[in-house]
Amino acid sequence: MNNRSLVAASLITAGAVSMSASAALVAGWSMPTAVTAATTGTNYTYGAADLGEATAGTSLSGFHSVAATTWSSPAGNGSTYSLSSNNWTAGDYYQVSLSTTGYADPITLSFDQTRSGTGPAAFTVLMSVDGGTNFTTVLASYTVVQAGLAGSGTTTWNSVTNQPVTFTTTVSGLSAAAGQASVIFRIQSTVTTAAAGTNRVDNI
């Protein structure tokens, strides 16, 4: 088994992709295509990873409990698109699934995330290694910053400027995810917000 890592990181910063001489990008989503206009519903599947060594069978998707949820693709964190949605209820999530068969520690997950002024700020990260039957918490809580908020020292997300310090969340030490046929990560809201409030992810 090779000593490689799942590094889902900012695709612009080379240092974030290679954590060691033997590190490898297993699967990454740079959001090269937009969500079809006027897409609504409780479930949405963006599709397979466009970067990495093991993209076959991967998937980026989302689930919301409100059927009126709109899925869209505004500008990302230095990339053309991101995956965004509104109508957030506690328990709603973005999800990535992949296989780490043939990969050993260190396993690391990284992604960019922001929100609108009324979008959810409180999230947790869950992981399953048995196809989604059981989930464990791998990041208990973190706060999502509103891009461009006065005093935050940030600008709104756009296709040119990447702001990894403020908007990138990294989860490392995921030993249980190594060498698994099925690994699922959920980026899950722990709060319910106004229907119009949005949250978006990029560079997973």
For each feature predicted by the language model, list its residue ranges.
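Extracellular carbohydrate-recognition regions
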Residues: 23-57
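Extended, low-complexity, turn-rich repeat/linker tracts enriched in Gly/Pro/Ser/Thr and Asp/Glu
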Residues: 102-105, 114-122, 194
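Terminal, low-complexity interaction segments
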Residues: 26-36, 117-118, 135-204
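Surface-exposed, low-complexity/disordered Ser/Thr/Gly/Pro/Asn-rich loops and linkers
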Residues: 53-105
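Conserved Ser/Thr-centered positions that define the repeating blades of beta-propeller domains
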Residues: 126-129
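Short, threonine-centered small-residue motifs that mark membrane-proximal processing/anchoring sites
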Residues: 2-25, 204
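Short glycine-centered, acidic/aromatic-flanked micro-motifs in structured strand/loop junctions
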Residues: 98, 113, 187-189
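Structural beta-strand segments of beta-rich domains
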Residues: 107-109
